[in-house]
Regions:
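PDZ-domain C-terminal substructure recognizer with occasional recognition of PDZ-binding tails
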Residues: 228-270, 365-391, 396-404
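PDZ/PDZ-like domain segments forming the peptide/carboxylate-binding groove
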Residues: 166-221, 331-336, 348, 357
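Short, glycine/polar-rich helix-capping loops at beta-to-alpha or helix-loop-helix junctions
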Residues: 355-366
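Terminal targeting segments of Actinobacterial cell-envelope proteins
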Residues: 1-47, 138-142, 151
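Glycine- and Gly-Pro-enriched alpha-helical subdomains that act as flexible
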Residues: 308, 328-353
């Protein structure tokens, strides 16, 4: 009997997992890919996922680089040498123009400093800008509402900053002339009244001559500081007689004094007027500087006027920067962004910086490499600091480190 073997079964003696024959047309080899429903093989394309990831990354980058975010970035701003010149209407002109007094040339620099601010209305920043600022030690990122409230337009903010700049310039003139003895008194002119005082008593343009409280002595304040000191001695609700010069004639006004706001920290009472305070002098100064706002250059403006109107070179040829508000009595007050201002001054080449003593906590640890920073509380101290730097003897000057460790 002839034995017929099933060709699909292994031959005798062959391993069970070794094929001994193939069906017609079949090719031995790897397992064929699974077919799709349509009969075509399903093939994976990993490069498609790569392209999708790249596209999403590009879209994310574009969004980060173009969509504004509610942040403000403060960084080092420009500096101006107040003893130098600026371009105005295509011509070079002195930044400070003094009239009514002899002026003297200066060889050094007294730099006013600024902060560059981005993120307020009209100057948006993006997430990419913010990320860059996080890694820049000279920049700081703040919430927008801390710097520019949403209900204030760019135009309104500009107007406020320009008014602050103008006021600081006027006050700098008064402080400088009083410091140098070119004026020995001030003119106190009413420019407005508070809501509590209302209209009908003072008029804009009234010049305050004297104040007499009921049952008290008459005082003729010759400076704003004297007026402030007098008002601290008069209780709220006291009837006073105020003599003003109105249209060239003395006019007597009777009123009761007002109570200061609970959070004002002031003692005594108020007249309820806003004053324009100017030095009683024929000397005056104007400023050729546009597109810069805020009150923080007052101290440097005052130093510039002093250098221009006194013999010799106050700076001794040194490059000195600084910042600080100024009051008519010469008090130098705190400002914002002092770290950025020091960095900007260093970038401009200044080796010395005058900082308000009230800002020293923000100065220590942020001084640029190679820069000497000195604390000043008033204009007289600032003049002494510049003179010490010019003479090469700063041993008597106060550092911010010394202020913070008192």
């Amino acid at each position: 009997m002839t034995e017929h073997l099933d060709p699909t079964l292994p031959a005798p003696g062959a391993p069970a997992d070794t094929p001994t024959s193939t069906t017609a047309g079949a090719v031995p080899g790897p397992e064929a890919p699974e077919n799709t429903a349509g009969g075509r093989p399903r093939v994976a394309h990993p490069w498609r996922w790569l392209l999708a990831g790249v596209a999403l990354g590009i879209l994310a980058f574009i969004a980060a680089a173009t969509i504004p975010v509610p942040k403000v970035i403060e960084g080092p701003g420009r500096t101006w040498n107040v003893l130098g010149t600026v371009q105005s209407d295509g011509q070079s002109t002195d930044l400070i123009n003094v009239s009514g007094a002899q002026t003297y040339d200066a060889q050094g620099a007294l730099r006013m400093t600024t902060v560059s601010v981005s993120g307020c209305p009209g100057y948006p920043v993006t997430a990419l800008d913010v990320i860059h600022a996080w890694f820049d030690p000279d920049e700081v990122v703040l919430d927008r509402d801390q710097v520019c409230p949403r209900d204030v337009t760019a135009e309104q903010q500009h107007e406020v900053e320009q008014a602050q700049m103008t006021s600081s310039q006027d006050t700098a003139v008064t402080a400088a002339l009083m410091e140098t003895g070119q004026a020995d008194s001030m003119i106190l002119t009413v420019k407005g009244t508070s809501e509590e005082r209302g209209d009908g008593v003072f008029k804009a343009g009234d010049v305050i001559r004297s104040i007499t409280p009921a049952g008290g002595q008459t005082t003729t304040p010759s400076t704003y500081a004297q007026l402030q000191e007098l008002m601290t001695t008069i209780a709220p609700g006291t009837e006073v007689q105020v003599v003003v010069s109105r249209d060239g004639q003395d006019t007597s006004l009777t009123m009761t004094t007002l109570e200061p706001g609970k959070d004002s920290g002031r003692q005594g009472s108020l007249l309820g007027v806003m004053l324009d305070v100017r030095a009683n002098s024929d000397v005056n100064a104007t400023f050729s500087l546009s597109d810069v706002g805020g009150p923080s250059a007052g101290s440097m403006f005052a130093l510039g006027i002093i250098d221009k109107t006194t013999p010799g070179d106050l700076t001794g040829g040194k490059d000195i920067a600084g910042t600080g508000t100024i009051s008519s009595d010469g008090t130098i007050g705190p400002i914002g962004g002092i770290s950025q201002k020091m960095a900007g001054a260093s970038d401009a080449g200044s080796q010395y910086f005058l900082a308000p003593a009230s800002n020293c906590a923000d100065v220590v640890g942020h001084e640029p490499k190679g820069m000497e920073v000195y604390a000043v509380s008033n204009l007289h101290e600032a003049v002494q600091a510049v003179e010490g730097i010019a003479a090469g003897d700063t041993s008597s000057l106060t550092t911010c480190q010394a202020v913070t460790t008192r």
